[in-house]
């Protein structure tokens, strides 16, 4: 992906730099940050700019605020970042208001200003050029390091790039790394290449599954989405999650896999319960024996053994989506065991999607995975072969 302008191609010396980060981090009810991976991932790019004598303006969204609310303020992010960098972070009270503009204007080399939540400005999600122009006017250089939002044409991701020429815009280290990993995975995977796809819905991953089939050697389908495939094969799945309107599509994927010589593996047993709760009774049952009115909520021990066998000779594994309702302890075992088996092997292991990254963190396997993507939707769209608006905007025109 060398046609993307990199931060290293830009003369940053003593410039004022705008870095679009992805600080969309999970918080508890008291607004404490529960996972700061995305903040830590931004540090190499921030440090590189500081080392080049820059003054740095950081911007991100957090959640999906309908209005300006302290619940969605980036204050907790500023505090965590200050701790991680061991450096004061100047916090703006707004995005392009008087406070932000004054602080941006007075920012000195080596200082960092964090703007308030970008989505407090209605124009951000509308790719508003006026907002983009206001943001661009604060700085001399634009860097995008927010892979997690590159699939969205938003003001701070796409429109803003129109106000910078190729010598003054580029991709940060995290964005570059994400794109390189996804592109190598699709173009030059070490084989056998196994995709492990889970999560609740087929609809969200249909395009990715279709695009992956010609590229993988084996495909494992788990999680709630597996039941639509099992139903398509004629199994009675009780009250398990089903996307009735996608049965035909599921059949097409199974047929396409067969025609391409790709082995597709589905669960052979499940953890079934009458309700999706920690207190519900549960039992392990073969997929053909799910009791009436019960639902499958995790893969069972025989499926875990089967999937372990399937990935045992893999050289590359791409994992997106948990194997069950991992948020509930008794239905998390399948996902956690998959995480252990994927991380213990010698394969290049790439984890995509927020839920999957949460499983890996909970299993204590994060350090053993080759790469954990910071973007859910964005990593899925790259695998689908789509051009992301935020990435396209950073392409060098000579290479288009």
From Swiss-Prot:
ATP binds at residues 205, 296, 327, 353-356. GO terms for biological process: gluconeogenesis; glycolytic process. PANTHER family: PHOSPHOGLYCERATE KINASE (PTHR11406), PHOSPHOGLYCERATE KINASE 1, CHLOROPLASTIC-RELATED (PTHR11406:SF23). Pfam families: PGK. It catalyses: (2R)-3-phosphoglycerate + ATP = (2R)-3-phospho-glyceroyl phosphate + ADP. PROSITE patterns: PGLYCERATE_KINASE. Substrate binds at residues 22-24, 38, 61-64, 119, 152. Belongs to the phosphoglycerate kinase family. Pathway: Carbohydrate degradation; glycolysis; pyruvate from D-glyceraldehyde 3-phosphate: step 2/5. The keyword Iron does not apply. Monomer. This is Phosphoglycerate kinase. Its EC number is 2.7.2.3. GO terms for molecular function: ADP binding; ATP binding; phosphoglycerate kinase activity. Keywords: ATP-binding, Cytoplasm, Glycolysis, Kinase, Nucleotide-binding, Transferase. InterPro entries: Phosphoglycerate_kinase, Phosphoglycerate_kinase_CS, Phosphoglycerate_kinase_N, Phosphoglycerate_kinase_sf. It is found in: Cytoplasm. One of its GO terms (cellular component) is cytosol. It is an enzyme of class 2 (transferase).
């Amino acid at each position: 992906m060398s046609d993307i302008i990199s931060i290293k191609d830009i003369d940053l010396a003593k410039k004022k730099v705008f870095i679009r980060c992805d600080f969309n981090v999970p918080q508890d009810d008291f607004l404490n940050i529960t996972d700061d991976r995305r903040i830590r991932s931004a540090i190499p790019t921030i440090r590189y700019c500081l080392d080049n004598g820059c003054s740095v303006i950081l911007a991100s969204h957090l959640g999906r605020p309908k209005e300006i609310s302290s619940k969605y303020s980036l204050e907790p992010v500023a505090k965590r970042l200050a701790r991680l960098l061991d450096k004061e972070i100047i916090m703006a009270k707004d995005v392009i208001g008087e406070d932000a503009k004054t602080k941006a204007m007075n920012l000195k080399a080596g200082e960092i200003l964090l703007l308030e939540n970008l989505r407090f400005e209605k124009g951000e999600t509308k790719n508003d050029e006026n907002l983009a122009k206001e943001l661009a006017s604060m700085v001399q250089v634009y860097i995008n390091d927010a892979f997690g939002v590159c699939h969205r044409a938003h003001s701070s991701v796409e429109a803003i790039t129109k106000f910078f020429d190729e010598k003054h815009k580029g991709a940060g280290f995290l964005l570059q790394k994400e794109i390189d990993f996804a592109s190598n995975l699709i173009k030059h995977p070490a084989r056998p290449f196994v995709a492990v796809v889970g999560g609740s819905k087929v609809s969200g991953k249909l395009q990715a599954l279709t695009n992956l089939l010609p590229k993988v050697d084996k495909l494992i389908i788990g999680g709630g989405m597996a039941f639509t495939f099992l139903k398509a094969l004629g199994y009675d799945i009780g009250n398990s999650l089903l996307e009735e309107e996608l049965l035909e599509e599921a059949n097409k994927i199974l047929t396409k896999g067969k025609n391409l010589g790709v082995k597709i593996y589905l669960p052979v047993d499940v953890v079934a319960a009458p309700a999706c709760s920690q207190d519900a009774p549960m039992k392990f049952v073969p997929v053909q024996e799910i009791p009436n009115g019960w639902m499958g909520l995790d893969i069972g021990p025989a499926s875990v053994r089967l999937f372990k066998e399937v990935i045992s000779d893999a050289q590359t594994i791409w994992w997106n989506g948990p194997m069950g309702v991992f948020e509930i302890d008794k239905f998390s075992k399948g996902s956690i065991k998959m995480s252990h088996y994927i991380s213990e092997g010698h394969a290049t292991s790439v984890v995509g999607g927020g839920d999957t990254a949460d499983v890996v963190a909970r299993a204590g396997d994060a350090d053993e995975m080759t790469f954990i993507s910071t973007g859910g939707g964005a990593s899925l769209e790259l695998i689908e072969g789509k051009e992301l608006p935020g990435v396209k905007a950073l392409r060098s025109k000579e290479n288009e």
